[in-house]
């Protein structure tokens, strides 16, 4: 029984030829990939691959047309992959670090005042920071207050206390208008007068009956006197009828 299957590669490759593809692989050249492992010793030197830069240009400009026309007969790996990685794709024409250094030097040369002004500004800024950090320029409101620290108590003169006592006995609760008048007359603030009256009322409640303030007692006395007078008048009317 005969088979009509024919391998299509037989017509392209002759007997004894390798069937490996001829396209290039940029990892290693063909000679290196097929060779055995190299052993480096103290007496041996590492192989160097040198390739002129004009081959790279030939690969980009003429290699593409030759590869497409010749059917991959020319191996471009021998042209492109044997050179140094830094010189591949024309990297040797871009001096990056030297270009940056030259640009920085030219800017300093063209504008010499900028460097001196920047140095002076930095020194002045450090001086201001040192001055601000000094404790001698700390304002009172910037200093942290100790826990439990209280402000000093207001001391009243004898004349002020006497006038405030008189006002308290007359009326323990001051209106806003009367409070302003008393504060102006005694040379005190409205808040100081208010606090003094609050403390005086608390003291009065502790010393006497809690529900009876001086003004309240006076009102009760007037009410009791009025009730007694009414009772007397009623008794006199009843006696006159009899």
From Swiss-Prot:
Entries under SUPFAM superfamilies matching the protein: Homeodomain-like
Major location category of this protein: nucleus
Biased composition (Polar residues): 124-136
Membrane-spanning ranges: none
A matching Pfam family: Homeodomain
SMART domains with a match to the protein in the record: HOX
Biological process annotations from GO: anterior/posterior pattern specification; negative regulation of transcription by RNA polymerase II; neuron differentiation; regulation of transcription by RNA polymerase II; skeletal system morphogenesis
One MF term in the entry's GO annotations: RNA polymerase II transcription regulatory region sequence-specific DNA binding
DNA-binding region positions on the chain: 149-208
CDD domains registered for this protein in UniProt: homeodomain
Location of the region described as Disordered in the Swiss-Prot/TrEMBL record: 112-154, 206-242
Subcellular localization(s) per the UniProt record: Nucleus
Keyword terms of this UniProt record: Developmental protein, DNA-binding, Homeobox, Nucleus, Transcription, Transcription regulation
Protein's UniProt keywords contain Transport: no
Residues spanned by motif Antp-type hexapeptide: 138-143
Biased composition, class Acidic residues, residue ranges: 221-242
Family recorded in the similarity comment: Belongs to the Antp homeobox family.
Name of this protein: Homeobox protein Hox-C8
Natural source organism: Gallus gallus
């Amino acid at each position: 029984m005969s088979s009509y299957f024919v391998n299509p590669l037989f017509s392209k490759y002759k007997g004894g030829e390798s069937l490996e593809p001829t396209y290039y692989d940029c990892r290693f050249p063909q000679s290196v990939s097929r060779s055995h492992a190299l052993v480096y010793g103290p007496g041996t030197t590492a192989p160097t691959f040198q390739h002129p830069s004009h081959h790279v240009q030939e690969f980009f400009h003429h290699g593409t047309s030759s590869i497409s026309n010749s059917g991959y007969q020319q191996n471009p790996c021998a042209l492109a992959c044997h050179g140094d990685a830094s010189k591949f794709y024309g990297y040797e024409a871009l001096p990056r670090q030297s270009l940056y250094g030259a640009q920085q030097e030219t800017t300093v040369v063209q504008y010499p005042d900028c460097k001196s002004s920047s140095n002076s500004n930095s020194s002045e800024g450090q001086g201001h920071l040192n001055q601000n950090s000094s404790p001698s320029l700390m304002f009172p409101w910037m200093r942290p207050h100790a826990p439990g620290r209280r402000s000093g108590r207001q001391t009243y003169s004898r004349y002020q206390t006497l006038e405030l006592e008189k006002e308290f006995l007359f009326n323990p609760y001051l209106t806003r208008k009367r409070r302003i008048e008393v504060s102006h007359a005694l040379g005190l603030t409205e808040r100081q007068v208010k606090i003094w009256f609050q403390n005086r009322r608390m003291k009065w409640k502790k010393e006497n009956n809690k529900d009876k303030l001086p003004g309240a007692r006076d009102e009760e006395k007037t009410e009791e006197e009025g009730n007694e007078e009414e009772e007397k008048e009623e008794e006199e009317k009843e006696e006159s009828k009899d």
